[in-house]
C-alpha cells in the first residue's frame, strides 16, 4: 500500500485562464492535453470548452488539473453556501510567507478573501489564516506560519497545495472510510478553537458550545503533506448538500498515487466499502498515456482518485 497522500487537485472551472495565470505567476509549469472520449467519461464531463491544463508546482510533487467547462455548468458548492455546510471537498490549503501581500496578489487573480488574515495561536504555532473563494466556488485557505519558522528552505511567496479539508456530518463514518482507503489518522482536536481561530469558519460568537469543532487529520505516512482534514461541527444542526457533485464546477477530486494498485483495488472491492467505488479500476487515457486508475466517492461526497504511480 502506498504511503503517500494526494499529489494532485482536480478543478472543474469556467475560468481556466484565470486559474492558470494564478499558478503560473507562482512559478508553476503548465502542460496542455487534449481530451479523449475516455477522459471526458472519467471526469463526467458532457461538454468542455478547450483542452485540459495540468500545472506542476516548482518545488514539490504536486499538480493542479484544470478541466474547462461552460459557465452554464452549475456549481457543486454554491457561492452563498454557509461555510460549515458539508458538501464534498471543501478547500485546498497553501502556505504563504506574507499573508497581507498574498491578500492583494490573490485578488488580482480572481480570488475574493472572506476575511482579512486572522492571527491566532494553535498549540505552539502562531499563524495567520484566511479563506478566499473564486467564481467556481473553489475555496482556498491561506496559512502564514508566524512562529516558529517552518522547517526546510524558505519559500519565495506561496507553497504547493499541502492539504485539503472536507466538512462532514458523520465524522466517525468519514474517518472509517479514510482508514479503509489507507489514510491513517495522526492528529485530532475537539472543542473551541483558541483565540480568534473560530473567525476562520465564521464560528466566533456562536452561543454555548455551538462554536466547538471536531478536527482530524489523516495521511498514510502520518505527515501533513498530502493529508486530508475532516471537520465537523457536532453542536450545530446542518443540512449537507447531498446532490451528486460529479461534473459540476468546483473542487472536483484529489488524486492519490499508489503502489500495487490492483491489490489495493481488489481489497476495497471485496470489502465493506465496495459501495463507494465510483469508477472501477481500468486503464484510461490520462495526459495522453494509459494510466491504471479508479475513483471512489466518500460518504460525505468527496471524490478521491487512485492511480498507479
Identify the meaning behind each predicted range:
Residues 235, 247-255:
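Low-complexity, glycine/alanine/valine/leucine- and proline-rich hydrophobic stretches
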Residues 1, 11, 33-35, 51-54, ...:
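Vicinal oxygen chelate
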Residues 1-71:
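Hydrophobic, helix-prone linear segments
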Residues 35, 45, 76-81, 198-201, ...:
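ER-lumen resident redox/N-glycosylation machinery signature
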Residues 74-86, 97:
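Post-signal peptide N-terminal segment of secreted/secretory-pathway proteins
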Residues 6-7, 87-91, 161-162, 249-252:
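Eukaryotic phosphotyrosine signaling hubs
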Residues 44-45, 81-83, 154-155, 244-245:
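Short consensus segments that form the blades of beta-propeller domains
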Residues 15-30, 102-108, 170-185, 270:
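Amphipathic alpha-helical segments
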Amino acid at each position: 500500500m502506498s504511503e503517500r497522500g494526494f499529489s494532485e487537485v482536480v478543478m472543474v472551472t469556467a475560468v481556466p485562464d484565470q486559474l492558470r495565470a494564478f499558478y503560473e505567476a507562482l512559478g508553476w509549469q503548465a502542460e496542455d492535453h487534449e481530451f479523449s472520449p475516455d477522459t471526458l467519461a472519467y471526469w463526467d464531463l458532457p461538454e468542455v470548452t478547450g483542452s485540459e491544463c495540468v500545472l506542476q508546482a516548482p518545488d514539490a510533487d504536486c499538480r493542479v488539473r484544470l478541466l474547462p467547462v461552460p459557465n452554464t455548468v452549475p456549481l457543486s458548492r454554491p457561492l452563498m453556501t454557509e461555510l460549515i455546510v458539508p458538501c464534498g471537498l471543501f478547500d485546498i490549503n497553501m502556505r504563504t510567507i506574507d499573508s497581507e501581500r498574498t491578500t492583494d496578489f490573490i485578488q488580482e487573480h480572481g480570488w475574493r478573501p472572506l476575511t482579512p488574515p486572522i492571527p491566532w495561536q494553535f498549540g505552539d504555532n502562531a499563524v495567520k489564516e484566511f479563506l478566499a473563494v473564486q467564481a467556481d466556488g473553489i475555496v482556498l485557505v491561506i496559512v502564514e506560519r508566524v512562529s516558529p519558522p517552518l522547517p526546510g528552505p524558505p519559500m519565495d511567496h506561496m507553497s504547493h497545495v499541502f492539504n485539503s479539508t472536507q466538512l462532514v456530518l458523520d465524522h466517525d463514518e468519514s474517518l472509517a472510510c479514510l482508514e479503509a482507503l489507507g489514510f491513517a489518522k495522526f492528529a485530532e482536536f475537539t472543542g473551541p478553537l483558541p483565540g480568534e481561530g473560530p473567525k476562520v469558519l465564521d464560528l466566533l460568537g456562536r452561543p454555548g458550545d455551538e462554536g466547538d469543532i471536531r478536527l482530524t487529520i489523516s495521511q498514510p505516512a502520518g505527515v501533513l503533506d498530502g493529508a486530508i482534514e475532516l471537520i465537523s461541527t457536532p453542536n450545530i444542526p446542518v443540512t449537507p448538500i447531498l446532490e451528486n457533485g460529479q461534473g459540476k464546477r468546483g473542487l472536483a477530486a484529489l488524486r492519490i498515487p499508489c503502489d500495487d494498485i490492483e491489490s489495493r483495488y481488489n481489497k476495497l472491492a471485496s470489502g465493506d466499502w465496495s459501495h463507494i467505488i465510483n469508477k472501477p479500476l481500468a486503464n484510461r487515457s490520462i495526459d495522453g498515456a494509459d494510466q491504471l486508475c479508479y475513483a471512489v466517492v466518500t460518504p460525505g461526497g468527496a471524490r478521491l482518485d487512485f492511480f498507479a504511480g
